């Protein structure tokens, strides 16, 4: 059987496919595996109780149940949801948006597939454009979504070494140079995998840079503000008519509902909705229906701020303390935890590299993610990307502590301690 170039691109191996395969095998074949690799959110009891209550009420109403189960959404997504979300964004964030500025997708992964291919790839006259990533490491799922080669360009970040075996990445604005072949600038805030949060001043500089080059700034807010608000530092919500913000319900504890949200000026939303209709026909109804109920009852933001954020802040603090204890005396550093649900461990000069360390940990029953695939668009050789691991602390706290102890033991063995 001969397969197309499309099949080679999307049917072959990639970092995100390896990640999801590991997660699937861990659940079905190795159920005792300590899961510190994937992006599944933790279980927040207050959130789960609220979701059961609101979903139950929706399904008990015959008209609402039919609207969820028996009809297709419009191409841009459910009108009531988009209007309710726009009202909240105007009231809470001061964004000048209406329902016409919002589109729904079947998860933010599919949203980025459409967005990146709207702004980058092949253009008239044989020209090609790329997405500029000002700060890598970046989300592993970006790496393979382009329909053409060379979809991403990135450069090394600035690295600030901090006390207590911490460090922090920053945008190296001196080396950041969009050009005529740049179709858009994209950042995640907080950043998956590192937990980095770009400051307001950095976002303002990126916004000005994008405007100066006539290209949009895309902000991946899957972990950010205004929801799910997995932030441990101050960060002002940012949007204007040159910004595309992508939000998600997944990290509220709802990854199974596959609901991504695009907030942009109307012409971008219209183009996105047309492309998304061709690819998906329509989006699922359950996520928007549940989110509308939460918005109508004024529950979405209090849930994020009073339950989701404290849950992850506490988990981050405990995991950071445990990991710092394990790496004491080793040439390792942890990225400053400012948000999201991961610790990013830099094992400087680790013998054999982080992929070999990942394999050894997997053999010992701990699933993490090696760092190499989190550097999309970075062409130049850099040993740093083979020295890092992403660790999730979202799952059962005792198992996370046990996993961190095994990681520490394996690191000491690796360094000959």
Question: What are these regions, as identified by a protein language model?
Answer:
Residues 24-28, 342-389, 400-402:
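Conserved C-terminal alpha-helix-loop-beta "cap" of PLP-dependent enzymes
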Residues 83, 87, 91, 95-96, ...:
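PLP-dependent enzyme catalytic core of the Aspartate aminotransferase-like
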Residues 39-43, 109-110, 138-141, 190-193, ...:
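Short, solvent-exposed loop/turn segments at secondary-structure junctions
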Residues 234-274, 283-287, 400-404:
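Active-site PLP attachment segment
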Residues 269-271, 289-311, 325-326:
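Amphipathic alpha-helix from the class-I
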Residues 306-320, 332-347:
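Conserved glycine-rich beta-strand-loop-beta hairpin in the small C-terminal domain of fold type I
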Residues 67-213, 218-240, 244, 415:
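Conserved core of the PLP fold type I
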Residues 1-76, 87, 91, 213-215, ...:
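N-terminal "arm"/small-domain region of PLP-dependent enzymes with the aminotransferase-like
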């Amino acid at each position: 059987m001969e397969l197309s170039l499309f099949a080679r691109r999307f049917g072959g191996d990639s970092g995100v496919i390896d990640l999801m395969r590991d997660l699937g095998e861990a659940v079905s074949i190795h159920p005792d595996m300590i899961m510190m690799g994937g992006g599944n959110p933790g279980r927040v009891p207050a959130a789960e109780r609220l979701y059961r209550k609101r979903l139950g009420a929706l399904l008990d109403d015959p008209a609402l149940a039919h609207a969820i189960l028996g009809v297709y959404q419009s191409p841009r997504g459910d009108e009531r949801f988009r209007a309710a979300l726009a009202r909240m964004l105007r009231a809470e964030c001061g964004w000048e948006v209406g329902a016409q500025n919002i589109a729904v997708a079947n998860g933010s992964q599919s949203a980025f597939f459409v967005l990146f291919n709207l702004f980058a790839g092949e253009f008239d006259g044989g020209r090609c454009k790329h997405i500029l990533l000002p700060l890598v490491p970046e989300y592993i799922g970006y790496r393979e979504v382009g329909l053409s080669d060379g979809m991403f360009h990135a450069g090394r970040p600035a690295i600030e070494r901090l006390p207590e075996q911490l460090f922090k990445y920053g945008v190296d604005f001196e080396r950041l140079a969009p050009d005529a072949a740049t179709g858009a600038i994209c950042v995640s805030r907080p950043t998956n995998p590192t937990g980095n949060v770009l400051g307001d001043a950095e976002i303002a500089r990126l916004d000005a840079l994008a405007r100066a080059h006539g290209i949009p700034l895309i902000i991946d807010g899957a972990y950010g503000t205004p929801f799910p608000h997995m932030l441990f530092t101050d960060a002002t919500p940012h949007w204007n008519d040159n910004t595309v913000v992508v939000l998600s319900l997944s990290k509220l504890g709802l990854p199974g509902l596959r609901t991504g949200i695009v907030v942009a000026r109307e012409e971008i939303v219209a183009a996105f909705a047309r492309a998304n209709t061709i690819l998906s026909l329509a989006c699922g109804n359950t996520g928007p229906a549940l989110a509308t109920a939460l918005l109508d009852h004024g529950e979405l933001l209090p849930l994020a701020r009073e339950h989701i954020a404290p849950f992850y802040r506490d988990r981050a603090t405990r995991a950071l303390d445990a990991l710092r204890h394990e790496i004491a005396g080793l040439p390792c550093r942890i990225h400053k935890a400012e948000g999201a649900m991961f610790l990013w461990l830099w094992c400087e000069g680790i013998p054999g590299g982080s992929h070999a360390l990942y394999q050894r940990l997997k053999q010992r029953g701990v699933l993490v993610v090696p760092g190499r695939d989190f550097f999309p668009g970075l062409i130049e050789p850099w040993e740093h990307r083979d020295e890092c691991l992403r660790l999730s602390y979202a799952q059962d706290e005792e198992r996370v502590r046990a996993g961190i102890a095994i990681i520490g033991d394996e690191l000491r063995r690796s360094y000959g301690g």
